[in-house]
């Protein structure tokens, strides 16, 4: 489950799901990604998710992180940011699904190159889901999206 601008919507849906036997990992972005230095998730929400058996993981943005810090100061784009923009051609949620899958892979929370379902959304709740076999960020191009389960129409 990915972060979005309105995490409460996705997290409320999660509370309604029967997820016994399914590992759910909430992957969030580190401070500063959206221009503010507060945590993206409140302590209360994190505790609620953990009480539901959800693993909560916060890390640097896999498809920008330090590279965006350089490009915002020095100008231009680095290759990782270009790859992120290319993924957005398919859909913002697809880009986020790829990104959070790699972040979870980097942390050892999912098996490398084994299929998982990644769910993401940007701004309006979870609206995109893919089956992906994630690679770690150091092997970004080895990640494979096997299926797009759902995504909103691009407008």
Located regions from the model:
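Conserved mixed alpha/beta catalytic, RNA-binding, or beta-rich assembly cores of soluble enzyme
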Residues: 1-155
């Amino acid at each position: 489950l990915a972060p979005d601008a309105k995490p409460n919507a996705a997290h409320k849906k999660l509370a309604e799901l029967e997820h016994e036997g399914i590992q759910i990992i909430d992957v969030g972005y580190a401070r500063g990604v959206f221009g503010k230095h507060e945590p993206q998730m409140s302590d209360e929400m994190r505790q609620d998710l953990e009480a539901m058996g959800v693993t909560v993981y916060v890390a640097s943005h896999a498809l920008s992180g330090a590279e965006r810090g350089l490009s915002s100061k020095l100008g231009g784009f680095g290759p990782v940011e270009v790859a992120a923009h290319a993924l957005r051609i398919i859909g913002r949620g697809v880009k986020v699904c790829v990104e959070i899958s790699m972040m979870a892979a980097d942390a050892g929370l999912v098996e490398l190159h084994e299929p998982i379902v990644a769910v993401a959304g940007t701004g309006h709740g979870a609206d995109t889901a893919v089956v992906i076999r994630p690679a770690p960020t150091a092997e970004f191009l080895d990640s494979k999206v096997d299926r797009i389960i759902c995504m909103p129409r691009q407008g």
